[in-house]
């Protein structure tokens, strides 16, 4: 408990250690449970969205009270934006918001869980716990959204998603240069991540985003995958 309010990188958790793997197993369990509850007609997506709202509010409040809230903790990373897109989707619905979550934001959250940049904080610290918790909830929301029957992935919406992501990336790059921050890891790669490995062989590590996103989309929109999703999702009319 003494390390809860430690904000300095003094942790020693390593990538894919037993502790890291435990969090990944917890994420898998939470996603399966959320999808199962949503398929049975329960409000799993709404619960995940409300927990995301509370977690983000508590994160900002804690950082503010501790005097640590600065330009480096604004919600401009992909997963920071995902919190608000999930909240918007739960409140207003919309297939485009759902498509962004399914195609990009949830895979981004999963990638962050696989290669977290917060492992250098103490394992019991606020930043360590809240970072895992928020990313897990984004994945859980996506699972519930997908299994409740109210959203159906469509590759026809990907061109518009690409435009939105490109504009967002350009805006964040300008913000990074202006505030001297590193949102979306555009200026330099996160430690112990594929971006850092790409920096050793590519002229700019950000070039990895393009083949990575192409691979993700090829998998998520592979026709057998879409048919499997469609087969496993209940008819929304039966849930009313």
Please name every model-derived segment.
Residues 5-26, 161-167, 179-218:
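Membrane-interface transmembrane-helix boundary segments in multi-pass integral membrane proteins
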Residues 18-25, 67-79, 100-102:
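Structural signature of hydrophobic alpha-helical transmembrane segments
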């Amino acid at each position: 408990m003494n390390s809860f309010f430690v904000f300095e990188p003094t942790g020693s958790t390593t990538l894919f250690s037993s502790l890291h793997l435990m969090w990944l197993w917890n994420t898998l369990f939470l996603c399966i449970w959320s999808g199962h509850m949503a398929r049975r007609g329960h409000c799993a997506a709404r619960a995940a969205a409300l927990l995301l709202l509370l977690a983000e509010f508590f994160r900002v409040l804690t950082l503010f009270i501790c005097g640590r809230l600065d330009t480096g903790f604004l919600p401009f990373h992909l997963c920071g934006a995902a919190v608000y897109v999930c909240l918007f989707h739960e409140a207003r619905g919309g297939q485009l918001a759902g498509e962004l979550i399914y195609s990009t934001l949830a895979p981004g959250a999963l990638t962050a869980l696989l290669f977290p940049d917060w492992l250098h904080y103490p394992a019991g610290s606020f930043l360590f716990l809240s970072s895992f918790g928020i990313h897990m909830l984004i994945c859980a929301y996506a699972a519930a959204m997908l299994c409740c029957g109210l959203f159906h992935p469509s590759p026809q919406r990907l061109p518009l998603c690409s435009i939105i992501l490109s504009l967002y990336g350009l805006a964040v790059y300008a913000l990074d240069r202006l505030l001297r921050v590193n949102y979306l890891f555009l200026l330099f790669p996160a430690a112990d991540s594929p971006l850092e490995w790409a920096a050793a062989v590519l002229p700019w590590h950000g070039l990895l985003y393009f083949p990575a996103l192409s691979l993700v989309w090829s998998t998520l929109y592979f026709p057998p995958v879409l048919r499997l999703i469609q087969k496993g999702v209940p008819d929304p009319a039966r849930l009313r």
